[in-house]
Amino acid sequence: MPDTPGLLVSVRTADEVDDALAGGADLIDVKEPARGALGIAEPEVVGAVVEKVNGRVPVSAALGEWGPTALTEAHWHLELKLDYVKWGLAGYPHTPGWGEDLLDARRGLPAGMEMVAVAYADWERAKSIPPAEVAKFAKRFRFRAVLIDTCVKDAKTLLDFIKPAELAELVDGLKRVYTKVAVGGSLRPEQLPKLKGVVPDYFAVRGSACAGGKRDGVIDKSRVKKWKEAIG
């Protein structure tokens, strides 16, 4: 795995793809920020992004928070040529045997499409599963990708909920079993010096790559470039 992390940029529309790629994005993600941390975009939007990227980099899609209707709501998305799909676990019951429904869904994914296990660092606010438990689950069931993120998008960032040393331990433990790890959580480029010991496969960004630093803004190529330069 590379020593220098790549950059995952979440776009809202196909119109943002060119600026994201020109700024140096190594993976394009699709989400609708107005619908939450992992807000699901309309399938037509996701399809247009896949078409615009045209195989230049991998493409992932956020599909909302997992629940009884999650697969139905994502039916058309799962027909698209996506490399990764992910559901958040906000409100997910932390009970013995949790995750069996996720494993069932993963088995039904098209060939070549991977499910990303999502760990919310602010798991208490999200009423979700603790990150260490998600990491253990991902290792046990050989998930090929994990996202460490925050659920509630406010003035706080990932570092308000997890210490760099703890984050590094999670990331390194997953990478040792050949799981790709993306780290998000409303981070800003100027916070990277605090994360010197954290080497994920990708830093995942949206708000700090948008004009005005607002996640509901539009992708700004210069801000994407700033991230690439900060990563090194």
Residue ranges and their predicted role:
Residues 3, 7-15, 60-71, 119-124, ...:
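Glycine-rich beta-to-alpha transition loops that act as phosphate-gripper elements at the mouths
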Residues 27-38, 80-95, 145-155, 198-224:
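Glycine-rich phosphate-binding active-site loops on the catalytic face of alpha/beta enzymes
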Residues 54-159, 169, 173-177:
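Conserved anion-binding
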